């Protein structure tokens, strides 16, 4: 027990803190003022900015399309043209000899062969006419691209209206563009700057087609990536990439109203492949791919699945190049799709397959 006397109860008065009104707590907003001493401003680096090397690498990986201008006749055109004439002469002489020989055997055989030859000639002429119309349609799309870019650059209202009318003619048979064409019809009598009219037509008519085109490119890239990941032979990979790329080019051309024939498709495929260096640029773009995916593909995917991503990117680049070629207007108001729009989906698809294994 302690000898100390317990302390008596004592009352204490607590000092109430001064209440600060909510209005006084709010700081008065700073009045806007001009900064005259620029040395006081300290710029900060953006963590999402690419370095110069990475930006150059990404530019090489995903180049914009520039239509090549060909003037005159090349040696290859002269060669194949001459060979085509010789083959035509050979077929004509062979057909004539065959018909004469059949007339010698029996008149009805000769007349039958002559009738069949006339039917074949008429069908051949119809095919040639259809191919020429398709080639002319592709050429008109290329000229329209140049006219639209020139009208937007010069802000020429008359040239812009002419280009927009041509675009409406091309898109007349596409149901997805009906709403945009109706809107442009309502603005026929309005006064709009040439550049704004081009951008408006691109937004209202081509935006739905661009969304569908992105879906086509992404789905084709996914199919190529999956087939590459499960195929046992590299020859199967190459064959399927070629098949899927050819089908993608044709479907994109039909989507934008191109409807190419056989010769038109060959010319279109040549123009698409002309500005692609897929294998080399894909190999150079690993550091950019690492930044976009989040970490290195080699540490995330197996070798076979990594090949699937690369082949999918090859198909995506082919699709982007095809969009550049077959699109009636160049990308101005709308953002041009890039490799970065497809890398994440392809890597996620293949990593999910790797996780299930």
Curated annotation (Swiss-Prot):
Residues 27-36 have a biased composition (Basic and acidic residues). Residues 1-36 are annotated as: Disordered. GO terms for cellular component: plasma membrane. The keyword Transmembrane applies. InterPro entries: DUF697 (IPR021147), UPF0283 (IPR006507). It comes from Brucella ovis (strain ATCC 25840 / 63/290 / NCTC 10512). This is UPF0283 membrane protein BOV_0999. Belongs to the UPF0283 family. The chain crosses the membrane at residues 78-98, 109-129. It is found in: Cell inner membrane. Its main location: membrane. Pfam families: DUF697. It is a multi-pass membrane protein. The keyword Cell membrane applies. Keywords: Cell inner membrane, Cell membrane, Membrane, Transmembrane, Transmembrane helix.
